[in-house]
A protein has these predicted regions:
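Sec-dependent bacterial lipoprotein signal peptides
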Residues: 1-21
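Bacterial Sec signal peptide processing site at the extreme N-terminus
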Residues: 18-36
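Post-signal peptide N-terminal segment of mature Sec-exported envelope proteins
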Residues: 30-52
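Short, solvent-exposed coil/turn segments at beta-strand boundaries
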Residues: 40-44, 63-64, 118-121, 144-151
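Stable alpha-helical elements in mature extracytoplasmic
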Residues: 41, 89-93, 164-171
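Conserved polar/disulfide-associated segments of primarily extracytoplasmic proteins
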Residues: 53-138
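A short, solvent-exposed beta-edge/loop patch
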Residues: 124-158
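Surface-exposed amphipathic alpha-helical segments
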Residues: 147-178
Length: 178
């Protein structure tokens, strides 16, 4: 093969490799790398201008018990301001979830929120369950760090309160710094 053709082929391969880098998932710091945890190439999946996804990983039963999903997102501008206010006062979120705009009937969900104490950044824990109590609650936690106009947020959703809060604190320590 002539040298010029090899060079052109190498440039094409390099260009294609660089173009697909967005499809290579970034692992979430603070959760184990590799199986049973799976990282997703989130940046190419979400095209909204509201948040920049940084990383997403999940671990599903039966390999992982309890099941957990962890994400790291960056917000800017007004979205960062609103989210930062909710991180500091999670009862705002609970009120909005209980009486969403445009609904005539109240939501039939038990919602409880509480600030995360002893956390290095503002954040909260939340639980959501059907009001009839037929299903177990889902748990969530969020912690965020402000940096200028942007806000980096760690979100964790899972099946047990303790696992969610422990994971949120551990990931926030690694992703947001201590």
């Amino acid at each position: 093969m002539p040298l010029r053709l090899c060079f052109r082929s190498a440039i094409v391969v390099l260009a294609l490799s660089l173009a697909t880098c967005g499809y290579i998932p970034r692992p979430v710091e603070g959760v184990p790398a590799g199986a049973p945890w799976e990282a997703l190439p989130l940046r190419k999946w979400l095209a909204e201008d509201r948040a920049e996804p940084q990383a997403l990983a999940f671990c599903a039963p039966p390999e992982c018990s309890p099941g957990l999903a962890v994400s790291v997102v960056r917000l800017k501008g007004r979205d960062a301001q609103i989210t930062h206010a909710v991180l500091r006062d999670p009862e705002r979120l609970a009120r909005a979830l209980r009486s969403p705009a445009g609904r005539d009937k109240p939501v039939r969900t038990r919602i409880s929120v509480e600030p995360l104490k002893d956390a290095p950044y503002p954040g909260f824990a939340i639980s959501l369950a059907p009001a009839d109590g037929r299903k177990a609650p889902a748990y969530g936690a969020a912690l965020g760090r402000r940096s200028g106009e942007s806000l980096d947020v760690v979100l964790v959703i899972g099946e047990t309160e303790e696992a969610v809060q422990d994971t949120a604190r551990r990931v926030a320590e690694r992703e947001l710094g201590s």
